Amino acid sequence: MEIGELRPLKEMAVKPGSVFRMRFYPQDGIVPKDSSDTSRDKYFIILGKDNKGGYVALSLINTAINENLRQRIGAFQYQISSSDYEFLNGKDRFVDCYDMKEVASERIIEQGDYAGLISETDLKAIIKLVNDSPIVSVAKLKRYEIYYVD
């Protein structure tokens, strides 16, 4: 039996550092790969939860850095190694720390597939980059209790 099939375990897994895979749509701010597609499956890392637990803040995991945006967002992309994480399927990827998405916890529990857990070292580095991002507001960081502690 997998964790994705067990709601109570999945609820416990919705916490900072957990990685899930879920389908996103244009209304989520995610552009499908092909013009004929209406959605896109993405891996993401949970960074924090609001104090009521109804929403989480997350960073998306991308296969590559968008070349059209590299100059603006490149410094806020954190590379994670496939040798450290089985769910990466043998390919290093990038965590987008330039921006973070806000998603209902219930949606992740209902639709997300648990993939794994990011190491404390990687999570700390990701949180630092998110805190340094010029577009993530202090109010949003406070709402989700995403603080970088050296």
Placement of each model-derived feature along the sequence:
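Mixed-charge, Lys/Arg-rich low-complexity intrinsically disordered regions
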Residues: 1-14
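Structured loops at beta-to-helix junctions and adjacent beta-edge loops in soluble globular domains
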Residues: 23, 61, 98-100
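Short, charged beta-turn/beta-strand-edge "cap" motif at the junction between a beta-strand
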Residues: 25-29
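Compact nucleic-acid interaction/catalytic patches
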Residues: 30-41, 46-84
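C-terminal terminal-subdomain/extension
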Residues: 77-150
